[in-house]
A protein has these predicted regions:
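Short, flexible loop segments at the rims of nucleotide/cofactor-binding pockets, characterized by
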Residues: 1-5, 73-77, 106-107
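Alpha-helical membrane-targeting segments
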Residues: 1-7, 58-69, 147-151, 250-251
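Catalytic core of membrane glycerolipid acyltransferases/transacylases, capturing the structured
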Residues: 17-78
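Short acidic-hydrophobic, aromatic-tinged amphipathic segments that line or gate anion-handling sites
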Residues: 10-11, 72-75, 164
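Non-catalytic C-terminal accessory region of glycerolipid acyltransferases
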Residues: 80-252
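Structural motif corresponding to alpha-helix initiation and N-cap regions
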Residues: 10, 59, 80-83
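A short, well-structured juxtamembrane/interface segment
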Residues: 1-20
Length: 252
């Protein structure tokens, strides 16, 4: 932080409880969000255990750090196991961080929310704390080069704890999203820079980021490309095993 000369704007950190379990629901615009969203709990002397996709834990650089901090890996094929682990953390009085949008928003608008955050809060009976992170997309996000130049401003806004009612996950998820949309707008308006046409600003604020619809198409293409890479990799492994299969070696 100091080495990069980051100007950090913190608002509402007093809303993070000093004890007991809580779900921290965070907006998602950057690969760095889990790092800076954790600062929301620091004034209360708390740590946040973030749920993050398995690929982050498999990475040679981020993996050791994620495991040492006891964050929670989310394997798409074993989602229930990750969910159960998160509930155990909450019951033990920990704060669990989750990104309801699941993936980075290329439009820098709020995407469709998954219901996991409200389901966890309702299941254990803990408050949900809405958090908005802004400015991290200028440093490291999808489709743009990294920029760690000095003096950038990062903003973090924490909303009041929300009591989540059971039996209506879709309605409660919509309520959380509406609350976070309001916090996001407040955060952007208080941000010291809003240059017209900036790539890191959403269209609704005069920026040139993709619209939600354009971003959705880019997300679909990204998934297709990733599937193509995984399929090709699996085919290469299969071809390699076939070439090494003993009967095939003798025949050649």
């Amino acid at each position: 932080m100091n080495a990069l000369g980051i100007q950090l704007q913190l608002r509402g950190t007093e809303h993070v409880p000093r004890s007991g379990g809580a779900v921290l629901a965070c907006s998602h615009v950057s690969y760095l969000d889990f790092i800076f969203a954790g600062w929301a709990a620091q004034p209360s002397g708390r740590l946040v255990r973030f749920m993050a996709k398995q690929e982050v834990f498999n990475h040679r650089l981020s993996g050791p750090a994620m495991r040492s901090l006891h964050h929670i890996p989310v394997d798409r094929g074993r989602g229930l196991e990750s969910y159960a682990t998160a509930l155990d953390y909450l019951r033990a009085g920990e704060i669990v961080g989750i990104f309801p949008e699941a993936t980075i928003s290329r439009s820098f608008e709020l995407k469709t929310f998954k219901s996991g955050a409200v389901r966890m809060a309702a299941a254990v009976g803990v408050p949900l704390i809405p958090v908005v992170v802004w400015g991290t997309q200028r440093m490291y996000t999808k489709d743009h080069p990294r920029d760690f130049s000095r003096g950038q401003t990062l903003a973090l806004t924490v909303g009041e704890p929300m009591t989540i009612q059971t039996g209506n996950p879709l309605g409660e998820t919509a309520r959380v999203k509406a609350t976070m949309a309001r916090l996001r707008d407040e955060t952007i308006r208080a941000y010291p820079e809003m240059p017209q046409g900036a790539w890191w600003l959403p269209v609704s604020y005069g920026g040139s980021a993709p619209t939600l619809e354009e971003a959705a198409r880019l997300d679909v293409q990204e998934r297709r490309d990733r599937l193509g890479v995984l399929t090709a990799r699996a085919q290469r492994r299969a071809d390699r095993r076939w070439r090494l299969w003993p009967p095939f070696r003798k025949a050649t």
